[in-house]
């Protein structure tokens, strides 16, 4: 777990067996905030940019010069949805992440919303790394945790 003034990272590691051996599963939630300056911050492009800059700074891999970034290509396009949750505007982004200079990746889900004083955007990001295992249940678990934080 890592923490700074505008960044919190919580992760859970577990080992799980399948027919090919034992594999690491990681579920993580990352919370970060940034100044709110424009409605344009609630776009896929901006959300990818801020997510990738935070990830490059804090979500490092074990391989030298490795860090997490979002994928947004033909094979793994990011998707977004604007919604209201308890009268709060929320911009939801889903997609896939990968490690630069390493061979890791998986799904992520991100919720961006304004702080109570409307001066900051708060992002709550959940990601899963689970090679050889179904990831949809794991990402739904994180989504439930994130959703409860929005209530």
Locations of regions flagged by a protein language model:
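A short, polar/proline- and glycine-enriched secondary-structure boundary/capping micro-motif
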Residues: 20-22, 102-104, 133-138
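Surface-exposed amphipathic alpha-helical segments
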Residues: 1, 119-151
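Signature of long, low-cysteine stretches enriched in small and polar/charged residues
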Residues: 52-118
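Compositionally biased, intrinsically disordered low-complexity regions enriched in proline and serine
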Residues: 37, 47, 59, 68, ...
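Generic preference for hydrophobic/aromatic residues in regular secondary structure cores
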Residues: 28-33, 80, 108, 124
């Amino acid at each position: 777990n890592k923490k700074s003034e505008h960044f919190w990272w919580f992760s859970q590691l577990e080992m799980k067996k399948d027919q090919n051996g034992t594999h690491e599963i990681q579920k993580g939630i990352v919370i970060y905030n940034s100044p709110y300056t424009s409605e344009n911050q609630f776009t896929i492009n901006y959300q990818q940019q801020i997510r990738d800059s935070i990830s490059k700074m804090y979500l490092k891999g074990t391989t030298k010069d490795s860090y997490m970034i979002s994928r947004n290509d033909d094979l793994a396009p990011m998707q977004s949805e604007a919604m209201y949750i308890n009268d709060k505007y929320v911009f939801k982004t889903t997609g896939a992440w990968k490690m630069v200079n390493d061979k890791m990746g998986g799904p992520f889900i991100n919720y961006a919303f304004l702080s109570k004083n409307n001066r900051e955007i708060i992002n709550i990001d959940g990601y899963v790394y689970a090679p050889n295992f179904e990831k949809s249940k794991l990402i739904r678990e994180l989504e439930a945790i994130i959703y409860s934080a929005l209530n």
